[in-house]
From Swiss-Prot:
Keyword Oxidoreductase: yes
Residues that hold (6R)-L-erythro-5,6,7,8-tetrahydrobiopterin according to the record: 98
GO cellular component, one term: cytosol
Keyword annotations of the record: Calcium, Calmodulin-binding, Cytoplasm, FAD, Flavoprotein, FMN, Heme, Iron, Metal-binding, NADP, Oxidoreductase, Ubl conjugation, Zinc
Family: Belongs to the NOS family.
Bias-annotated ranges (Polar residues): 24-37
Origin species: Macaca mulatta
Protein's name according to its UniProt entry: Nitric oxide synthase, inducible
Length: 162
């Protein structure tokens, strides 16, 4: 099946890995050689085509990029990278082409510590919310105990004796 991004679903048991620059180089080499895949390093004589510099830029993108949805565990073969307008930020071990980090959701490191007049109200709000949630979680059991024992005091005495 396909999803809304034209990703083609692959078997869930297939192993997934990040696309590496080495994968892209291998693909561009095999494409140059009329789609006949050949190993980059042979066991015999090494031809100039089989030697690839690690920092060489690939001439073309692979037809499919394997993408894993870590939430569902499903693996897809994505083709949207063919429509990319810019060069993807790829290294030999990872590709950041599909990671979305909008500036509105990211913050850089602060130049200086948060001033106390800004930090104190945030801390007070955090503590109040924490206490409010904690108390709300305890209200039903306390009410049940009060109804069972007839009073809050008896409920607390029974709790300590148990």
């Amino acid at each position: 099946g396909k999803d809304i991004n034209n990703n083609m679903e692959k078997a869930a048991c297939a192993t997934s890995s990040l696309v590496t620059q080495d994968d892209l180089q291998y693909h561009s080499l095999s494409k140059q050689q009329n789609e006949s895949p050949q190993p980059l390093v042979g066991t015999g004589k090494k031809s100039p085509e089989s030697l690839v510099k690690p920092d060489a830029t690939p001439l073309s993108s692979p037809r499919h990029v394997r993408i894993k949805n870590w939430g569902s565990g499903m693996t897809f073969q994505d083709t949207l990278h063919h429509k990319a307008k810019g060069i993807l930020t790829c290294r030999s071990k990872s590709c950041l082409g599909s990671i979305m980090t909008p500036k509105s959701l990211t913050r850089g490191p602060r130049d200086k510590p948060t001033p106390p007049d800004e930090l104190l109200p945030q801390a007070i709000e955090f503590v109040n919310l924490s206490l409010e949630i904690s108390v709300q979680d305890q209200i039903p059991p306390v009410c049940n105990d009060c109804q069972y024992y007839g009073s809050f005091k008896e409920a607390k005495i029974e709790e300590h004796l148990a």
